[in-house]
């Protein structure tokens, strides 16, 4: 226990944050299943939860919380060094790579794991720098979809035009799944080009050190949470908006170069 700085104590309340909760819940499930195997049915409803809590409590406080606390600290250190580096090129590279890879993570359902990292960063610094960059990924999809729309119009693919028309408003507001599963992912190439285009916006946002005080949808709706950062609220909101425009343009350009009219006609 650190008497001088209690918040730095290994056993302080909340140590490990979301990571500790996830791992603790996993342990609870495993132990509960084991207890339920040998517990008589007549006693199950009362004693199974009690025994499970007793068996989990001490290891959770003495092992899981401190261990995940160190992991959280390490993750925050890495994010801080990359996303908040004084070296501009480091922030640019980190922003581009993380944003370009975010769409594949969304498609595989792995992007929810980043929420834990958001929580860790918010708890430690009071703001999140990774979320504004990753929010650019959806804007790249919008640019890619617009490029495909014009090609679909040119080749007469009415079905694809209608799908894009219905999905674009949601994409502008940060809901990217209709565009992912209805347009870009089935065609493969636009899925890649959207990420490559969005990377430019992510690099810009990370370079300008845009920060958010919360997280939620991406796109235009995220403008309302870009209220932190070293340059002030107005700069964060403005730079985020510029980042969106960059993603729209670069997503359009990269997709226009990578996807042919024949690809759209056969979609």
Report the location of each language-model feature.
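Hydrophobic core segments of alpha-helical transmembrane domains in multi-pass membrane transport
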Residues: 18-30, 52-62, 99-104, 140-148, ...
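Alpha-helical transmembrane segments and their membrane-interface boundaries
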Residues: 47, 55-59, 63-136
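Juxtamembrane interface elements at the cytosolic ends of transmembrane helices
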Residues: 22-40, 67-75, 113, 254, ...
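Interfacial loop-to-helix junctions that mark the boundaries of transmembrane helices
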Residues: 3-16, 40, 44, 83-87, ...
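Helix-loop-helix junctions within the multi-pass membrane cores of secondary transporters/permeases
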Residues: 115-198
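Early transmembrane hairpin of solute transport permeases
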Residues: 1-33, 203-208, 235
């Amino acid at each position: 226990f650190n008497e001088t700085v209690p918040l730095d104590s290994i056993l302080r309340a909340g140590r490990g944050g979301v990571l500790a909760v996830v791992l603790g819940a996993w342990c609870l499930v495993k132990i509960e299943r084991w207890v339920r195997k040998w517990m008589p049915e007549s006693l199950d409803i009362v004693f199974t939860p009690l025994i499970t809590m007793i068996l989990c409590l001490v290891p959770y406080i003495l092992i899981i919380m401190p261990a995940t606390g160190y992991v959280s600290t390490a993750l925050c250190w890495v994010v801080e060094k990359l996303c908040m580096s004084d070296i501009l090129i480091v922030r640019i590279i980190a922003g581009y790579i993380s944003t370009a890879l975010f769409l594949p993570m969304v498609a595989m359902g792995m992007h929810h794991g980043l929420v834990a990292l958001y929580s860790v960063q918010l708890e430690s610094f009071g703001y999140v720098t990774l979320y504004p960059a990753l929010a650019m990924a959806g804007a790249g999809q919008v640019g890619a979809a617009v490029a495909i729309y014009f090609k679909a119009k040119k080749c007469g693919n009415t079905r694809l035009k209608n799908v894009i028309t219905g999905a674009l408003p949601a994409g502008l507001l940060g809901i990217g799944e209709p565009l992912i599963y209805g347009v870009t992912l089935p065609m493969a190439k636009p899925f890649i080009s959207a990420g490559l285009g969005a990377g430019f916006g992510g690099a810009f946002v990370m370079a300008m050190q845009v920060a958010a005080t919360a997280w939620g949808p991406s796109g235009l709706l995220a403008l309302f949470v870009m209220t932190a950062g070293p340059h002030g609220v107005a700069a964060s909101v403005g730079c985020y908006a510029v980042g969106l425009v960059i993603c729209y343009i670069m997503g359009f350009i990269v997709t226009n170069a990578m996807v042919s009219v024949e690809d759209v006609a056969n979609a």
